[in-house]
Amino acid sequence: MNAGTPQHSSAWDPVGLGLIPMVVEQSGRGERSYDIYSRLLKERVVFLVGPVNDVTANLIVAQLLFLESENPDKDIYFYINSPGGSVTAGLAIYDTMQFIKPNVSTLCIGQAASMGAFLLAAGEKGKRFCLPNSRVMIHQPLGGFQGQASDIEIHAREILYLRERLNGMLAKHTGQTIEQIEKDTDRDNFMSATAAVEYGLVDKVLTSRADT
């Protein structure tokens, strides 16, 4: 998790994901084509793919709010494959997940590291999942600010504040004590899907659709 200057990136421009498949649907009004992510959004599936930054956060927040307006009583499915990124961008997603009325079910595909792991754990209790070969990693916020000594001190205090806030929220979602969270996030802490269940980051490992 990067606690420094918010990241500005063109990431989550679909072009950055390579060739995006198109889906063509037929109806009485003719044919309509969607990119695959837009089609899955109709099924209430939201993706976090790649780094967490201001661009990805804004897109995900907008999708969550849209799906709430479509049906406030139906679950949203949040698929995560992310190495993490900006703390402030991640907290924008987190706060929206907690704010909206629909339950948000989270699923790790590939990896959920740093802020990705935090968002994975923030899903609705009992509806947080990992696929069998997923990897989950937690650690403390990172900072890389440069400048005058007084400014460095200000940013150091901000990082310590964010670490305390994040540890408290992670303790709430996992059931671990804050002291245990502080110890376990002191360095990069990688977990298998099974270990993530044991730690309380997720509730179940899914091996097939029938497990949901």
Curated annotation (Swiss-Prot):
It comes from Azoarcus sp. (strain BH72). Fourteen ClpP subunits assemble into 2 heptameric rings which stack back to back to give a disk-like structure with a central cavity, resembling the structure of eukaryotic proteasomes. Belongs to the peptidase S14 family. The lineage of its organism: Bacteria, Pseudomonadati, Pseudomonadota, Betaproteobacteria, Rhodocyclales. It catalyses: Hydrolysis of proteins to small peptides in the presence of ATP and magnesium. alpha-casein is the usual test substrate. In the absence of ATP, only oligopeptides shorter than five residues are hydrolyzed (such as succinyl-Leu-Tyr-|-NHMec, and Leu-Tyr-Leu-|-Tyr-Trp, in which cleavage of the -Tyr-|-Leu- and -Tyr-|-Trp bonds also occurs). GO terms for biological process: protein quality control for misfolded or incompletely synthesized proteins. One of its GO terms (cellular component) is endopeptidase Clp complex. The active site is at S114 (nucleophile), H139. This is ATP-dependent Clp protease proteolytic subunit. One of its GO terms (molecular function) is serine-type endopeptidase activity. The keyword Magnesium does not apply. The keyword DNA damage does not apply. SUPFAM superfamilies: ClpP/crotonase. Its EC number is 3.4.21.92. Pfam families: CLP_protease.
